[in-house]
Structure formats: C-alpha cells, structure tokens
Curated annotation (Swiss-Prot):
Belongs to the AIR synthase family. This is Phosphoribosylformylglycinamidine cyclo-ligase. One of its GO terms (cellular component) is cytosol. The keyword Glycoprotein does not apply. Pathway: Purine metabolism; IMP biosynthesis via de novo pathway; 5-amino-1-(5-phospho-D-ribosyl)imidazole from N(2)-formyl-N(1)-(5-phospho-D-ribosyl)glycinamide: step 2/2. CDD domains: PurM (cd02196). SUPFAM superfamilies: PurM C-terminal domain-like, PurM N-terminal domain-like. It catalyses: 2-formamido-N(1)-(5-O-phospho-beta-D-ribosyl)acetamidine + ATP = 5-amino-1-(5-phospho-beta-D-ribosyl)imidazole + ADP + phosphate + H(+). Its EC number is 6.3.3.1. It holds the Pfam family AIRS. GO terms for biological process: 'de novo' IMP biosynthetic process; adenine biosynthetic process. Keywords: ATP-binding, Cytoplasm, Ligase, Nucleotide-binding, Purine biosynthesis.
Amino acid sequence: MSGNTSSLSYKDAGVDIDAGNALVDRIKGAVKRTRRPEVMGGIGGFGALCELPTKYKEPVLVSGTDGVGTKLRLALDLKKHDTIGIDLVAMCVNDLIVQGGEPLFFLDYYATGKLDVDTAADVVSGIAEGCVQAGCALIGGETAEMPGMYEGDDYDVAGFCVGVVEKADIIDGTKVAAGDALIAVGSSGPHSNGYSLIRKVLEVSGADKSEELEGRTIGEHLLEPTKIYIKSALKMIAEHDIHAISHITGGGFWENIPRVLPEGTKAVIDGKSWEWPAIFNWLQEKGNVETFEMYRTFNCGVGLVVALPKDQADAAVELLKAEGENAWVIGEIANAEAGEEQVEIK
C-alpha cells in the first residue's frame, strides 16, 4: 500500500461530476422546447425512446452524423458559442432532407478537457434552437470531460440525427433526366464547410476579423449559422415532383451534385444566374483563390440544388420564396458522354 494517506477523488483527476449535473439543470428548459409528441420519457435515462409518427404507412428510417469542422476554432477565438449548435444540427438534418427525410430526433456529443458550464450551456442551447428550427427533438447526448485530451478551453462537438421518410417517397436521384430544371436555394454564408481554407486566408492575408463588410464584421459573417432548410423543403417536396436534392457541403458543387445524379447525366449551371454573397468575394480576393477552387470548396451562396420537372420549376421557386427562402432557377440537367464531368458551370 502506498504511504500517501490523502484520499483522491474523481475531481482531483480533473473530472467534475457536479459541473456535469449543473449543466444538465441549465439545459433542461432548452431541451423541453424541442419535444415532439412521439418522444417517450425525458432526459437523463440510459437510452431515449421515440415512436414513429402514425402518418407513415411504410416508414423508412434515415440517419446522419456530422460535426462543424474547424468553424469551431473561429467560435473559440471569438468566444461566441451560442450559434455553433445550430450549425451542428443543420449539418445533420440538411443531409436527411436530401432523401426526403423528416427529422425525428437528435443526439449530441460534447467533449472537452475541463467542462465550462457556461460555454457548454451556450452550445447546447444552440443545438436546441437548431432542433426547434428543424422540428426534431433533442432526446439525448453525452458530455465527456477528458483531462489531458484537450488544451485549455478547447472542445469538440458531434451530432447524430434520425428521420423518417415514406418508402414510396424516397428521393434517390433515379428519376433525374435530361431536361429537368435545377433550382438553387440560397445559403446564409459559408455554412460549416471550407473553414480550414478560410482560416488560412485570414492567416496569410493578415485580415482583421473585426473589419466591416456590408455593415457586419468579418467574424460575424463567418460565424453566421448554417441555414436549416427542413420546413421549407418538406413543403416543396409535398407539393412538387422532386427528382433529386443536393446539399452543397464540403467539396462544393463539383463533389456534391454528382452524388445525386444518375450515370449519363450532368448538371449545367448558369454561373451568371446569381451574385455571390459578399463574404465569398472577400475570401476570393483576400486569398487570391481561383474560381474553380471556390466552387470546389465553398457553397458560394447556394445551400441546396434541387432537380425537378421543368414545368414545375417556377412554382417551386415561388413556394420557396413564400417560405422565406432565396430561390431561383440555376440551370438544367443535360445528357453527358461517358467520362464527361457531371457538373458544368458556364
């Protein structure tokens, strides 16, 4: 037996159970706002229970998981944590809508070296706000305090979402055909992708994040939360014959649009059909980034690209605008030769 007679505790090792309990108490109100009628029980159990909505005849579950990448570093640098949770939810639920999925519930994972209750509460409150916007329930999560794994105030977050879609209504891209119109749904900014390049542009250019651009600081532009499209997109899906939806995330236009196109087709994008939001022009200028690289890294103002019959395009655009979205016809689907690129921007 060791000669040391002092008694060690978990707190001595850097894990504060009391802080974790305080966090749970702080977030209960925010979590309650997200509740759906299908949820069974409250937070704090080992597992969370959720029934399937009764309106679905042949329900198929659709799931997704994601993080917010190095946008988190900007949030840490600027000490602004109340919107990063919205980003986390958006990155998951916007992937579900690609297949027509209605988000049901969301779980989060928050990891840090030393738990700061105020910071964590801000993050979880943002997650709850994102869930409210998406119409899904925040039914559980994990807060991991891991001394020695994270430096200083650093933390990381991950999210997991489950949704449901009617089997007969799954959107899988198989109906996409030459002559289909392409609709763009506007983004709120860079969303949660391309931030390693953004941070490199800031570093190389020596730009000040407090510099103003169109009445807001660069930091505010860059931390603008990712837009959640669920409610407007579900309404569009209910009223129109949607052939495919692409969520423009990491890899930009070149990587994401081909993921929903069948072989032998390509998306022909009219690059003159919209003006990039100012933050993208600023990034391109400050970083001397080539246009091809911009489209391969950022959404350049386009959060979703939707394929549908040409004769429904105008009505779908008007529906989206009525729902508060910025939407426009951005191009069309054409036939593609074997080996030809599936995205062409004119």
